[in-house]
Amino acid sequence: MKKKIFNTLWVVGVLTFAGFCLPACHRELDVQQSYDFALQTMPVQKEIKKGETAEIRCSLKRAGNFADTRYTLRYFQPEGKGTLKMDDGLVFKPNDRYPLTREEFRLYYTSQSVDRQTIDVYIEDNFGKVQQQTFAFNNKKVEWFNQSLL
């Protein structure tokens, strides 16, 4: 009789243990696909004159690496007038998205204005995460003087 009670308790114990373990398992793996990222840049000049080009060295720093993550770049210029291009020569149009295929790249901003200029650069991944960085340039004053007065 004791053996039958022991066997019954053992079976109930095993079934209880299985009851706790089985709900924790499911067939689908929980794979993280979207990771945080940041756009880092080297210091950029603060003054620019019309026709001058400023180099912006950029680096995309990712918290993780998912193979199917794609990044795009776009920019908007709320102040001033100028052009922005990639180091491979591609000239960007404001608010158009361009695929970003490298983590290290350079942007070149060429001033076409004598006013204060601001550009907002946006990097977005295919999961909807966005990083924005603003670059502001003041007009570089050109000193004109008459050398005959010296």
Predicted regions and their residues:
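Bacterial Sec-dependent N-terminal signal peptides
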Residues: 2-7, 17-42
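First exposed extracellular module after export/assembly in secreted or surface-exposed proteins
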Residues: 2, 33-150
